[in-house]
């Protein structure tokens, strides 16, 4: 007999404001438990040191988490100049201390180097894998392995302030960009070394900063529900963003009710006005209910790629 999943069928996205000092997986599990969700997944880990936006997908929304992983991000970062650490942040050991001898003009010139399309060699202290093992495990054993430079794009790099030896920047970048590596490379260009002492992710894709909630806020709502003898979902579920917001930048294709049953069985259906080889967001009928994503195939038909399972939101045991 197949095991029944624990938790309730609840679909949506929580914009968690992760606190410092905890792993992204720890935060994810707390959110999953608060919502009593049967499935949950995050959309790009933040270092324990980092705070800020961590979209958590619940239920069927997990099917679209990859699209948020691939999206642009924005960070506010403060670096301490004059010290380089083995992890490029304040969680590591200081390996070199040097005086600050650069001018303001040299700093601005160095910042310009990181704007636009560049190549970045990932830090050894990252979750990227080499021969099946995360790089940080090699680093902890004092082993350095070869890493290939990867293309990244820094759309914006804004100077915020330089107060003493602390430099603050606002960075809007493509997926896979390591802010710690930018800071480490910047420190070497300036000849003084640098490491991250504060990192906050302020944006993922199009999601608004003011929609974030903390674990403490979620915990308080659960406690309030218990105190008032309410189901906690009555207070928590209003915080969920619709799961189709994960693919809001995909063009919408509306499938008429007459073709809906065929589509939901995984069959391709004919819809006019589609562009070949482009992912689209599929809605059904006059209600325009989101049911997944698809792409036009070689026969000019809309082929579903990922469809959601429609639940009645009843609790599973």
UniProtKB/Swiss-Prot annotation:
Q: Which UniProt keywords apply?
A: Isomerase, tRNA processing
Q: Which InterPro entries match?
A: PsdUridine_synth_cat_dom_sf, PsdUridine_synth_N, PUA-like_sf, PUA_sf, tRNA_psdUridine_synth_TruB, tRNA_sdUridine_synth_fam1_C, TruB_C
What is one process in the GO biological process aspect for this record? Answer: tRNA pseudouridine synthesis
Instruction: Give the catalysed reaction(s), semicolon-separated.
Output: uridine(55) in tRNA = pseudouridine(55) in tRNA
Query: GO terms for molecular function, please?
Result: RNA binding; tRNA pseudouridine(55) synthase activity
Active-site residues per Swiss-Prot or TrEMBL entry? 47
EC code: 5.4.99.25
Lineage: superkingdom: Bacteria
- What is its EC class? isomerase
Task: Establish whether keyword Manganese is in the entry.
Answer: no
Function, as annotated, reads:
Responsible for synthesis of pseudouridine from uracil-55 in the psi GC loop of transfer RNAs.
Which family is this protein grouped under?
Belongs to the pseudouridine synthase TruB family. Type 1 subfamily.
NCBIfam families from the UniProt entry: TruB
- What this protein is called in its record is tRNA pseudouridine synthase B
Q: In which organism is this protein found? A: Shewanella sp. (strain MR-7)
């Amino acid at each position: 007999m197949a095991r029944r999943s624990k938790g309730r069928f609840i679909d949506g996205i929580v914009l968690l404001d992760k606190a410092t000092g905890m792993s992204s997986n720890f935060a994810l599990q707390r959110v999953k438990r608060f919502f009593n969700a049967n499935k949950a997944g995050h959309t790009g880990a933040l270092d324990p040191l980092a705070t800020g936006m961590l979209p958590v997908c619940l239920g069927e929304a997990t099917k679209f988490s990859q699209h948020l992983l691939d999206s642009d991000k924005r960070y506010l970062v403060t670096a301490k100049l004059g010290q380089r650490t083995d992890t490029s942040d304040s969680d590591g050991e200081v390996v070199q201390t040097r005086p600050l001898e650069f001018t303001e003009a040299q700093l601005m010139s160095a910042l310009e180097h990181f704007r636009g399309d560049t190549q970045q060699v990932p830090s050894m202290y990252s979750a990227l894998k080499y021969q099946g093992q995360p790089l940080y495990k090699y680093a902890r054993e004092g082993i350095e392995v070869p890493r290939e430079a990867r293309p990244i794009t820094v759309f914006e790099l804004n100077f915020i302030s330089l107060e003493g030896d602390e430099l603050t920047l606002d960075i809007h970048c493509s997926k896979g960009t390591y802010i710690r590596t930018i800071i480490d490379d910047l420190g070497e260009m300036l000849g003084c070394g640098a490491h991250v002492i504060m990192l906050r992710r302020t944006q993922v894709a199009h999601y608004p900063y003011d929609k974030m909630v903390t674990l403490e806020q979620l915990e308080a709502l659960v406690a309030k529900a218990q105190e008032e003898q309410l189901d906690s979902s009555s207070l928590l579920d209003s915080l969920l963003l619709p799961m189709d917001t994960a693919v809001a930048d995909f063009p919408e294709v509306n499938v008429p009710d007459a073709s809906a049953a065929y589509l939901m069985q995984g069959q391709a259906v004919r819809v006019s006005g589609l562009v070949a080889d482009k992912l689209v967001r599929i809605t059904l009928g006059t209600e325009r209910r989101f049911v997944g994503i698809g792409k036009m195939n070689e026969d000019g038909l809309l082929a579903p790629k990922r469809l959601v399972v429609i639940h009645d939101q009843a609790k599973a045991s």
